[in-house]
Amino acid sequence: GCESACCKNLWQHGKKEKISSIGIIDPKQRKSWMIDATPDFPQQYRKLTVEHDTELAGIFLTHAHIGHYTGLIHLGREVMGEKNVPVFVMENMEEFLKSNGPWDQLIRLKNIQLNRIKKNVNIKIGDSLFIEPFLVPHRDEYSETVGYQVTGQNNSLLYIPDIDLSLIHISEPT
């Protein structure tokens, strides 16, 4: 297996952390949303829907790297057999999913329903709950990369899954 420090620690100590994903819960509507569908999707889905007694109302994807979208496969006919789960994606991510298997099968069989979103455009997901995608500098081999700002009635949070700091130019004050 992998010999990097983080993998060696896992193999030696056996503690496996979950891959980063955010759950958004609207307790009034009893609905939830996920940001990213990771390889740990089954546990993350269960935590949102069973432990918090909500219905999954949608999944917002950040980009086309393995830890951020591959959990979608669990929605297909070989596992959950879901129907029309809303998946919110930017333009290049949409094309990636439509053009590559097994993701295109999820679309054809209507396990997922793609909803194209645009950068810097707020999306209302609850009475006073909004989510807004914004572009993030990262390796964009297959799709653009976005972060999300989630805004509620009293608080907001910023989720940036991956970022390449070397691609950010910081100007010196003049």
Language-model segment annotations:
Residues 30-34, 38-88:
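Active-site metal-binding motif and surrounding structural segment of the metallo-beta-lactamase
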Residues 63-68, 138-140, 169:
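Histidine-centered active-site/metal-ligand motif
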Residues 54, 67, 110, 127-129:
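Structured loop/turn residues at beta-strand edges in well-structured enzyme cores
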Residues 62, 161, 174:
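Ser/Thr-centric signal marking residues that sit
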